[in-house]
């Protein structure tokens, strides 16, 4: 007499497999969404760091050179006819007392860094903050991705508000003056960050503007109210 051992094999039913696949796909979708968000946030932060570092470096260069305007000259050194809210031209005689310089260099403004103009140059739908030195290297790009630059002229130190996300300062404590009468300058530069992704997509970063400001005292003027 023979006997048979009955073996039962267990497994997943079709319904269980479908449920497992749905859960797996949901987890993969959530993971890909989080990854897309993280990548776009990182892209925006990298863009912000590069743009702000570029603009801050440009502001530092401008502030240092503007502070020395009018050195060994009558007046504040600002060329009023070539200066305004969006551009600034400054002059200084840096070699006036340099015994090693030529007579022409001591008596005239003909050397590098003595006649400088700052302005916004638009090219290929991009705004560049440029520095022009006719006696030096000509035109140099100080920063790109600049949305707006505004230069304010005052005859005394001022206070103001720099609203986040705006393009210029507000609530200034004193009235502006003409460039030739300025003793104190406020430079405001708006840096626009481009959008990352498409509206409605995971991790979308909308366009955003960051306002950077610098206060410059013209050292070669009598800023009695400073």
Protein language model annotation of sequence segments:
Residues 45, 74, 202-203:
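Short, surface-exposed loop/turn segments at secondary-structure junctions
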């Amino acid at each position: 007499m023979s006997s048979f051992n009955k073996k039962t094999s267990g497994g997943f039913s079709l319904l269980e497999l479908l449920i497992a696949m749905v859960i797996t796909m949901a987890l993969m979708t959530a993971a890909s969404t989080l990854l897309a968000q993280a990548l776009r946030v990182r892209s925006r932060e990298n863009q912000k760091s590069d743009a702000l570092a570029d603009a801050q470096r440009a502001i530092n260069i401008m502030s240092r050179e503007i502070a020395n305007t009018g050195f060994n000259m009558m007046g504040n050194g600002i060329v009023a006819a070539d200066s305004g809210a969006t551009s600034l031209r400054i002059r200084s005689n840096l070699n006036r007392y340099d015994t090693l310089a030529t007579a022409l260099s001591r008596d005239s403004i003909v050397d590098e860094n003595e006649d400088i103009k700052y302005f916004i140059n638009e090219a290929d739908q991009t705004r560049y903050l440029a520095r022009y030195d006719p006696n030096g290297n000509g035109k140099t790009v100080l920063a790109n991705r600049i949305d707006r630059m505004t230069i304010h002229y005052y005859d005394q130190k001022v206070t103001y508000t720099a609203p986040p996300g705006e393009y210029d300062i507000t609530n200034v404590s004193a009235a502006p003056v003409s460039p030739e009468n300025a003793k104190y300058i406020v430079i405001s530069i708006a840096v626009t960050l481009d959008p990352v992704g498409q509206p409605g997509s995971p991790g979308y970063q909308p366009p955003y503007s960051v306002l950077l400001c610098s206060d410059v005292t013209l050292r070669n003027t009598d800023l009695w109210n400073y």
